[in-house]
């Protein structure tokens, strides 16, 4: 037998050594891009912890009793798709949607998003990956943008103070109702809603009113003062377009309500307010609404930034975030979140609201729309919309149709009689969605995107149905006058601050946006190790579909045959989330985690009521819980009973047994977070569920920490009945600097009939809890982000991400434990996906606080960890799975260097008051000033580690003075003179 030729043998060896095609294709896996540490880096991290494999670590961290063994089947998405394949699949699904010109109105309007805003805000990770600006010194850019939003709302509504966005108009109305009940002196429990208020707003108000004993009464706006109500809600203009009359009509109406002891909420269209007298000018006490038409697409209902503005007397009762102006350590103006002591994470069940995340990114877009167009530009847009609407109205009258309102802004209600259904169909056939109000009326709402040709096309549709001819556009338009009383025309100035009058060219706008982004720290610059926040990668491929027209340009009340793709994507995402949680059903309607919590508790309440046990109203909440838990329980009409935690941070089972037995007859639920808020997997979680179930209660598992469980444990399997998820944490929707968020509620099969629904859509609402958000699917246009993430990761990738998150947290904890005590650990001295460093012993010895360390981290180019939650005087760190080892090590090295500085304070090498920690952060202005009086060097201040010489972030302001800011509350744009240098 002949020996093989040497060349042939070499070829065989070469072929055997080369990777297979399958191996080459596997290297394009998205999971490898999403998970930061490489396999080799993970091995090194595991070696630091003393574990041979990731599986061995997970076995030691997660209690065996709750480990899932099914591999988390995801159906067709069990195997991951590449980025390209996932985008192609989703593009095919989106293609089933049909983009039609929607003139439905009902609070949602077509709008042109200026390209400079689309590209440099909505599509810019410097804006969308930032967190809520709790650390003001590294958030000055978005704080300024949020202050612009507040100024815009205050000016247009003529109110004293506005907050930095609400979740949507409907929840803003519900919050306004409870605000009026808190601040008013009226003994009544009646809240009057005018019958021309948006239907979805009425739905949400009714949902919010029922558990707190408020009676909602509806009727004509003119009857508002006749019902002995503590509060009245008016729509301005009404849903059907009507204005009630002149300025005196509105003033007389509010005067009558005030004389009866009530207060008035106006739901106002901001674009209309550029032409119409502002609600603050005719006596409204609170003004709410939506800013969607200021450059934010329909998005099938969201996300959009709602707003609320109030009279000065009510500012401390206003929900949501509030940006104020203070001074920094050098006396320069600085922005910060003001009046934080009224928020849920501090006030708990006594908070003004449970709202946490709002809609900052969308609020920034809306404010920049106003900055870009300025007051004159906005007025021109409004005048054009009104002129076209008045022209359309005159033409319809010529054709022979009757309009219900003589005074209007942009919406017409047309009496169409028996032609209604056919007209509705004909309009759709010609590319227009109209609002069918009932069997005899159609609504038409115009917006800035509507053209002259489309007005003519509408005339032709209506004329054909009436067997008449369409009028001539130029002839009709030539005779048009304003379609509202002259006395209602706005006389007051608005948007007079220079910021709204200086950035109207694209170059100016582009550079302004860049200057703001440069002031901030977001994930595009550095890791954000905030505990309980899961600041993970928001991959570009996940973000791309958000602005596709097939997702962006769909009205939330478009006909079902135009939203087939949306429904398919939503159905698939719901199934994915059911698989991840172990529950039977999911609703994606809640547009924030706080709303998901609230919905979950309402579901529990409805379930008990369906069994004749509506008296069950006690909610057990561990003392370590996030503040939204007790705030949500209070909103749901439940009584909060606190359960103690033991010295290891776990629920005290003995105290739980005692409290559950004590309240057995009235026990509705327990709210627990898992892994716990203390960052550990409690061994006794199944026992907690058993105890509560044995006393007839339901188990609410807060899903804020789901990033530690996906693929490894499922709340629906270990005893949970209901959970909310934070898609803006676990499933990669970005935080947007404080919103948007999505807070789906997931339930067991026995609770599925009670998931949120809405009467406005005609759905059977006999069992569901009603609507908790304005749109049927909440913030629908950002749901593709989570769909993409899950589709690209697959079951194994999602599980690997969870394991990597746990590995990274334990790596950080282990490396920092010689320098800072890790407050809580579980079995084997390990943590879950986050760890809490106890700074209190160091503070006692050195005088250096957790705030000093947080501010000093800014000099190192890092966002601080979570401060003083859930334990005062601590720092909670959550690195997530997405940070590479080099970034983890950079953060660890910074923390070790800071500990070295603390030691120098203790030893006396640094003065206890004049040291780099007490004066952090250090601005470039301070470091480069001629005068340097500190007892440490400029280099120690600015470059505490050598790596900063090639990667230096300069905080734009020094430490913000919180006390000054709250004592001298100022929540409007700062006069430019304040920035003048002496």
UniProtKB/Swiss-Prot annotation:
Q: MF terms per GO, please?
A: glycine binding; glycine dehydrogenase (decarboxylating) activity; pyridoxal phosphate binding
> Keyword annotations for this protein?
Oxidoreductase, Pyridoxal phosphate
InterPro entries per record:
GcvP, GDC-P_C, GDC-P_N, GDC_P, PyrdxlP-dep_Trfase, PyrdxlP-dep_Trfase_major, PyrdxlP-dep_Trfase_small
> NAD as a keyword?
no
An example GO biological process term is: glycine decarboxylation via glycine cleavage system
Q: Which reaction does it catalyse?
A: N(6)-[(R)-lipoyl]-L-lysyl-[glycine-cleavage complex H protein] + glycine + H(+) = N(6)-[(R)-S(8)-aminomethyldihydrolipoyl]-L-lysyl-[glycine-cleavage complex H protein] + CO2
Q: Which CDD domains match?
A: GDC-P (cd00613)
The catalytic activity of this protein is classed by the Enzyme Commission as 1.4.4.2
The top EC class, named as a word, is oxidoreductase
Pfam families per UniProt: GcvP2_C, GDC-P
* Record flagged with keyword Nucleus: no
User: Which residues are annotated with the PTM N6-(pyridoxal phosphate)lysine?
Assistant: 729
Cofactor dependency: pyridoxal 5'-phosphate
Query: One GO cellular component from the entry?
Result: cytosol
Subunit (UniProt) = The glycine cleavage system is composed of four proteins: P, T, L and H.
- Please explain the role this protein plays, according to its UniProt record: The glycine cleavage system catalyzes the degradation of glycine. The P protein binds the alpha-amino group of glycine through its pyridoxal phosphate cofactor; CO(2) is released and the remaining methylamine moiety is then transferred to the lipoamide cofactor of the H protein.
* Similarity field: Belongs to the GcvP family.
Name of this chain's protein: Glycine dehydrogenase (decarboxylating)
Q: Can you name the source organism?
A: Ralstonia nicotianae (strain ATCC BAA-1114 / GMI1000) (Ralstonia solanacearum)
